[in-house]
Every structure is written in structure tokens, then in C-alpha cells.
UniProtKB/Swiss-Prot annotation:
It comes from Arabidopsis thaliana. Residues 10-56 form the F-box domain. InterPro entries: F-box-like_dom_sf, F-box_AtFBL13-like, F-box_dom, FBD, FBL13/AtMIF1-like, LRR_dom_sf, LRR_FXL15/At3g58940/PEG3-like. LRR repeats lie at residues 139-165, 166-191, 219-243, 275-300, 325-353. It comes from the Eukaryota. Residues 361-412 form the FBD domain. This is Putative F-box/FBD/LRR-repeat protein At5g22670. Transmembrane segments: none annotated. Keywords: Leucine-rich repeat, Repeat. The keyword ATP-binding does not apply. SUPFAM superfamilies: F-box domain, RNI-like. SMART domains: FBD, FBOX. The lineage of its organism: Eukaryota, Viridiplantae, Streptophyta, Embryophyta, Tracheophyta.
Length: 443
């Protein structure tokens, strides 16, 4: 097809200014930009200068083709800065490693966003020391690589750092790396028990969001009670903990975050055999530090620990909590009123339950928590119910005792239509303490 001037449409694209061509290529997937290099030397020059680079080894014919292409794009003789570099790859143990050089080249070209992901756990991929002094870096994600020790860190612009299943030479490296990022706001650290770091200290004056995960369960029962987490982050607004190994969680100089997601065990299985009194002190101090939280999500594992804790002393109060998402084991559900009593101003409650058997019993305290009398507006049972006696007793408990309830939502998991009909009839028989309550049934 020709234009009025007799120039082909393909030539019209080639006549575009350099900066516009570069912008067009930057908006294409990197693998598509690579293909344009065969059009001409000019197109090849532009395709190798795009600032957004994403390479996945699965899109190439093996690791060495992947490595050859990445080499070409990360040539340090090019003057263009790299806005983002993302590498996702795996290699066999005998394959030559180029990762250290690739990252070093990206640092030289003033990379701002770096994302390195390895799928294989064979061998170690070492990052270069130059990464520790990359003054242009804004976000960093490292997965399954090895971090060397350092003498100096300067990451003045780094705001987001995700460190997933990496290898560290000692506890101090990770602590110093985190504390050496003066504007860090978002931190995600995932470890397993082979990562060496047993005592994780997070110290940051700028941190707003913190996600910590430690998976010890996949390695079986690790007979070691020296695992510990210490958090000193006064500006923290979101905290997520997933940890089945650490015995102690210390929140030092932390103003209670607005939102927390807690799935921890406090190593309570071994503590029962050793010193549960000490664990009670750790649990008490931890949740007292969270007393100002507004939005809490809690796992069934943590709730089970708290149920055991409440045999000896009451929970701390959470006067500011307005939203609570809780996963309850059926055996702990009788403690629900006690939990709610600790949340006097709660407005929204979502419950995730185990499946009840038809004749399972549920005994709930006759005392009515303050939040049911004055503040609770929304309740949802997230797990589908089938009409078991214990399930219906729980539904009845909320409908008959919640004075300001606006909406009660439940899901049905019945196998037959007649079972659903029985549940609907029973719901209609329940007295509602709140005249304005809407019952929503999802089938």
C-alpha cells in the first residue's frame, strides 16, 4: 500500500523521529522489540536501546540463546539508561553464570527498577557489590540469589525491596542492608530455614509496609528455638507476618500499624514442652503493641495459640479495631465471644470456618460482647454452610444479639434443593435484634 507521495507505509514508520521510534519500541514486549532488529541497522540500534527490558528464558530456545540476547541488550557501551530490567531464568548447574556481569552492567546504565528471579535452586548466583551502591535504584526484587557481604551501602532512592528465598552470609548483612536504605517504604522478606538468617532485625525510620514470611514447615520439625523477629519501624502502617518457626516477635518503637495480617505460631508446640509461661509473655507483649490496629486478619493457627493463651489471662483490648477477618478452627469457635469482647468498637467481621459435621455441637457464652450491642454492622460467614446444627446456631447468635447489624451475608454449600429450603425456613424463624438488618444468602 502506498501513500500519495509514493512512500510505503513501512517507510513512513521508518521516517519517524528517533525519540518517537524509541518510545514505540519501549511499549512493545521485549521479545517483539528484538524481532524488529532484523529490519535495518537503524531498527537494530533502537531495539537494543529500549529502556524497559524483560527477558524470560521460557521464551527462548534454551539458556544460551537467552544469555546471548541479554548480553546484547546490556552492552555497557550504550549510553541509554535502563528504566527497568526483569530477568526470569533457570540454568543447569554446569551452565556458565553471567548474572553478576548483567547486574553490574545494568547498574552502570543507571537502572531504576531491577527484578531478578531464578527458578532453580542448583548452585549459587552471586550479585555484584556494585548493586549495593546503585544510586539510581528505586525498586529491587531478588529471588533465589546469593548476596555477598559488603563494606558500604548507598541506596539513597530505593523505596521498594522484595527479597525472596535468597542466601545471606550472616544475620547482620540483611539487617544492615535494610537499615541503609533511608527512604525505603515497602519491604518484603521471605526466608526458609536454610537461609541462615535466624534473627531478623528490621530497623527503618521510613518503612510503611512490611511483609515477612518464614516457612519452616516444609523442612519438618526443626529443633531450634533461636529464631526471632525484631521490628523497629515507627512509621509502619501495614504489617504481614507468616511464620511457623520463630518463637519471639518483638515490636520495638512501633506505633501500632493501621492494618495487620498475622499467621504465626510463636513456636507454641515446643513451648508447651519447655516454657509456655515465657511464650505467654511474648504473646501478651506482641498483641499489646498492636492494640491500636484498625484492621486485622488472623489465621486459624494464631487463633488457636490465642485460645490456649486465654485459658490463663484475657486478651489485650483493641479499642480502635473496626474490621476483623478471622479463620477459626471449630474447636476454638466457642472462644469467639471472648475475642469480640476485646474489640468493643468492631464494625465488620468476616469468619472463615472449617466444615461442620451435621451433629457437631457449638457452645457460645451467654454474655453479649459490647460490639454486638453497639457497633457491629456487617457480618459475613465466608465458608459455605450446609445447615449443620452448629452453623445455624452461629447464624442465630449474630442475628438475635446484634443490635445495629445492617447486613449479614452467608453462602450455601448444600448438595440438594430441599436442604437449601430447610435453611431458608430456619432463617425466617430467627428473631432479628436489628430491624434494619438485611440477610444476603449466596447460593
Amino acid at each position: 500500500m502506498s501513500t500519495k507521495r509514493g512512500v510505503t507505509s513501512q517507510d513512513s514508520i521508518s521516517l519517524l523521529p528517533d525519540d518517537l521510534l524509541c518510545r514505540i519500541l519501549s511499549n512493545l514486549p521485549t521479545k517483539v522489540a528484538v524481532r524488529t532488529s532484523v529490519l535495518s541497522k537503524r531498527w537494530k540500534r533502537f531495539s537494543l536501546s529500549v529502556p524497559l527490558l524483560e527477558f524470560n528464558v521460557s521464551e527462548f530456545h534454551g539458556y544460551y540463546e537467552f544469555a546471548r540476547v541479554v548480553h546484547g541488550f546490556l552492552d555497557t557501551s550504550r549510553e541509554t539508561c535502563i528504566h527497568k530490567l526483569k530477568l526470569a531464568f533457570e540454568k543447569k548447574q554446569h551452565d556458565r553464570s553471567y548474572l553478576t556481569q548483567w547486574i553490574h552492567n545494568a547498574v552502570k546504565r543507571k537502572v531504576q527498577h531491577l527484578d531478578i528471579g531464578r527458578w532453580s535452586y542448583l548452585g549459587q548466583e552471586l550479585i555484584p557489590h556494585s548493586l549495593y551502591t546503585c544510586e539510581t535504584l528505586v525498586s529491587l526484587r531478588l529471588h533465589n540469589v546469593s548476596l555477598p557481604d559488603f563494606d558500604h551501602v548507598s541506596l539513597p532512592r530505593l523505596k521498594t525491596m522484595h527479597l525472596i528465598d535468597n542466601i545471606y552470609p550472616n544475620d547482620a548483612l540483611l539487617e544492615n542492608l535494610i537499615s541503609s536504605c533511608p527512604v525505603l517504604e515497602d519491604l518484603n522478606v521471605s526466608r526458609d530455614v536454610e537461609n541462615i538468617v535466624k534473627v531478623l532485625r528490621v530497623r527503618s525510620l521510613s518503612l510503611k509496609s512490611l511483609i515477612l514470611a518464614l516457612d519452616g514447615d516444609r523442612y519438618g520439625d526443626i529443633e531450634d528455638d533461636s529464631w526471632e523477629v525484631v521490628i523497629d519501624a515507627p512509621r509502619l502502617s501495614y504489617l504481614s507476618l507468616r511464620d511457623d518457626q520463630s518463637k519471639s516477635f518483638v515490636l520495638s518503637s512501633v506505633t501500632s500499624p493501621a492494618k495487620v495480617d498475622i499467621d504465626v505460631t510463636f513456636d507454641v508446640v515446643r513451648s508447651v514442652l519447655k516454657n509456655f509461661l515465657l511464650t505467654r509473655s511474648v504473646v501478651r507483649n506482641f498483641f499489646t503493641r498492636l492494640s491500636s490496629v484498625r484492621d486485622m486478619t488472623m489465621s486459624g493457627t494464631t487463633l488457636k495459640v490465642l485460645s490456649r493463651y486465654m485459658r490463663h489471662e484475657p486478651l489485650p483490648q483493641f479499642p480502635n479495631m473496626i474490621q476483623f477477618y478471622a479463620v477459626f478452627c471449630n474447636s476454638d469457635l466457642e472462644k469467639l465471644p471472648n475475642f469480640l469482647e476485646s474489640c468493643p468498637n468492631l464494625k465488620s467481621l468476616v469468619l472463615e470456618l472449617e466444615v461442620f459435621k451435621k451433629n457437631d455441637l457449638l457452645i457460645l457464652s451467654s454474655s453479649i460482647p459490647k460490639c454486638l450491642r453497639s457497633s457491629l454492622e456487617h457480618v459475613e460467614i465466608h465458608t459455605p454452610i450446609s445447615g449443620a446444627e452448629a452453623e445455624m446456631k452461629l447464624v442465630k447468635y449474630f442475628l438475635e444479639n446484634s443490635a445495629v447489624l445492617k447486613k449479614f451475608t452467608l453462602q450455601l454449600g448444600c448438595k440438594r434443593m430441599d436442604e437449601e429450603s430447610i435453611i431458608f425456613k430456619e432463617l425466617l424463624r430467627f428473631r432479628r435484634c436489628s430491624a434494619s438488618c438485611e440477610v444476603v444468602v449466596e447460593v
